């Protein structure tokens, strides 16, 4: 096994449940009573293509040196010392406690890389705990449900990002993986060695009641704060004709048709050459953090002067960050020939932002409150698409059809072979295609796949990630076999 992860956190946050999920067996005792785990337990684990060792630890406790709790804490500290990285688990439903803060500081002092894991994220009320988790100083929380297996693709990505592909895909493990036979029937064995998960291919329905995080961005004076004030029905944010009044990222709670919304108003984002003051640089950085924390980002454009260079740069940033974009053409009340202007704006949207074909764009007047319901309907629909998951069976039946319709091209006299496709993540949708010679695959054929996915599975207007892998197993083959 190439690396070791220690699962740590205060008692009863779900550490042993996550341990069982990763090893594929119920090896650790799980109970609602704090302190069930007293010793550290180590076992081989598997998370999709990642093979590693995982250590389950006792819940961190503040205790006297001679007490049982103190000895449990010593075991946990030893596990942190032995591990290459730490999965610091919090209970998103219960929120952050003083104990979480105390032990987060201890983990930071250890100097070990950390993934902040927000467990029980499926529970109602967990969103507040997610927001509070940022105060621990351990980075962006990765929301999961260890009990139900939700969020495992995102946890896998977070581990790879933390340790780096070179570290987690070591050659000695790839030699083993290269010999594995991978077929659609084997998908259920990818999480854990012997896991029996009856819900493995069950695609959960979109939860339209779950709280939603929305960032509102745009050039200075595009009307972002005015829009939020109208949504909230109060003058919560300072507005005026002067560009750049908003200095930091301000959040506000809102409810739309019974759904809880967290709105982030951001400082106007200027070109780098125009960002001079230190305070303004910090404001723009704060806005970037808001984008990364948001799920959907509303790009507010001034309909009287839309699609300037900076508007396109902001949109490109949002797409590269993998967020779900929606355009609001603001100040629509100032437009005279609305039908002609709207047709022109739709044409420019499709032409200037082809990487998110079908991007939703809505004319509004933030000052008069016109078009806000229509805007929010499009926000919710875009969020649903951004969260969409497609079963492996449907994907590969579709793949057979598109290959039959348009076979992969021949490169250097040899036809490329496409073998298999699976979805490895959502938010945004991410897919892996197993093929021969991925480096030789023309980008035009990759776009053919992406455009086909959009059309067939109704996924307009969101970023779609598609990676090519060699080997029959789309998760293997990242390193060449030793000669």
Curated annotation (Swiss-Prot):
Q: Where does GTP 2 bind?
A: 218-225, 265-269, 330-333
Q: Residue limits of the EngA-type G domain?
A: 3-167, 212-387
Instruction: Please report the stretch or stretches of sequence annotated as the KH-like domain.
Output: 388-472
The family database entries (InterPro entries) matched by this protein are listed as: G_ENGA, GTP-bd, GTPase_Der, KH_dom-like, KH_dom-like_a/b, P-loop_NTPase, Small_GTP-bd
Q: Sorted alphabetically, which PROSITE patterns does this protein's record hold?
A: G_ENGA
Transmembrane parts of this sequence: none
Question: What's a GO biological-process term for it?
Answer: ribosome biogenesis
Positions of GTP 1 binding: 9-16, 56-60, 119-122
Q: Does the keyword Repeat apply?
A: yes
Sorted alphabetically, which keywords does the UniProt record give?
A: GTP-binding, Nucleotide-binding, Repeat, Ribosome biogenesis
**Molecular function GO labels:** GTP binding
**What's the family?**
Belongs to the TRAFAC class TrmE-Era-EngA-EngB-Septin-like GTPase superfamily. EngA (Der) GTPase family.
Q: How does it assemble?
A: Associates with the 50S ribosomal subunit.
**HAMAP family linked to this entry:** GTPase_Der
Report the function annotation for this chain: GTPase that plays an essential role in the late steps of ribosome biogenesis.
The name this protein goes by in its record: GTPase Der
> What is the originating organism of this protein?
Brucella ovis (strain ATCC 25840 / 63/290 / NCTC 10512)
Q: Recite the lineage of the species.
A: Bacteria, Pseudomonadati, Pseudomonadota, Alphaproteobacteria, Hyphomicrobiales
């Amino acid at each position: 096994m190439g690396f070791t992860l220690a699962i740590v956190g205060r008692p009863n946050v779900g550490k042993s449940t996550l341990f069982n999920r990763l090893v594929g067996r119920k090896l650790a005792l799980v109970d609602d009573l704090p302190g069930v785990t007293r010793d550290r337990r180590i076992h081989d684990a598997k998370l999709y293509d990642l093979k590693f060792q995982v250590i389950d630890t006792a819940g961190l406790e503040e205790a006297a040196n001679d007490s049982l709790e103190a000895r449990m804490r010593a075991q946990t500290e030893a596990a942190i010392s032995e591990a290459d990285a730490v999965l610091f688990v919090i209970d998103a439903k219960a929120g952050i406690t003083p104990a979480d803060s105390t032990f987060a500081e201890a983990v930071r002092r250890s100097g070990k890389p950390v993934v902040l894991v927000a467990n029980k994220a499926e529970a109602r009320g967990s969103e507040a705990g997610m927001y509070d988790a940022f105060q621990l100083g351990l980075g962006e929380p990765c929301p999961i449900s260890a009990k139900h297996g939700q969020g495992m693709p995102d946890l896998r990505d977070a581990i790879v990002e933390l340790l780096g592909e070179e570290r987690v895909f070591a050659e000695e493990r790839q030699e083993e993986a290269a010999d594995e036979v991978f077929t659609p029937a084997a998908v259920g064995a990818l999480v854990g060695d012997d896991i029996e998960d009856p819900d493995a291919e069950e695609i959960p329905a979109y939860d339209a009641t779950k709280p939603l995080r929305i960032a509102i961005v745009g050039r200075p004076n595009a009307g972002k704060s005015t829009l939020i004030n109208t949504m909230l029905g109060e003058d919560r944010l300072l507005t005026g004709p002067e560009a750049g009044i908003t200095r930091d990222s301000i959040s506000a709670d809102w409810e739309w048709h019974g759904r809880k919304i967290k709105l982030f108003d951001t400082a106007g984002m200027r070109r780098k050459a125009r960002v001079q003051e230190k305070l303004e640089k910090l404001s723009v950085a704060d806005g970037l953090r808001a984008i990364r924390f948001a799920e959907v980002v509303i790009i507010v454009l001034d309909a009287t002067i839309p699609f300037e260079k900076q508007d396109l740069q902001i949109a490109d940033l949002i797409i590269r960050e993998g967020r779900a974009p929606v355009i609001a053409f603001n100040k629509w009340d100032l437009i005279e020939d609305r039908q002609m202007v709207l047709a022109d704006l739709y044409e420019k949207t499709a032409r200037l932002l082809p990487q998110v074909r079908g991007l939703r764009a809505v004319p509004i007047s933030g000052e008069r409150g016109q078009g806000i319901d229509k805007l929010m309907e499009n926000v919710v629909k875009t969020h649903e698409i951004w969260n969409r998951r497609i079963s492996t069976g449907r994907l590969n039946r579709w793949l057979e059809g598109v290959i039959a319709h348009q076979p992969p091209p021949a490169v250097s006299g040899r036809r490329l072979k496409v073998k298999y496709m699976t979805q490895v993540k959502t938010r945004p949708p991410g897919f892996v295609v197993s093929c021969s010679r991925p480096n030789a695959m023309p980008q035009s054929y990759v776009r053919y796949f992406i455009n086909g996915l959009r059309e067939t599975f109704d996924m307009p207007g969101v970023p779609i990630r598609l990676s090519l892998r060699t080997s029959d197993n789309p998760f293997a083959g990242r390193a060449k076999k030793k000669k």
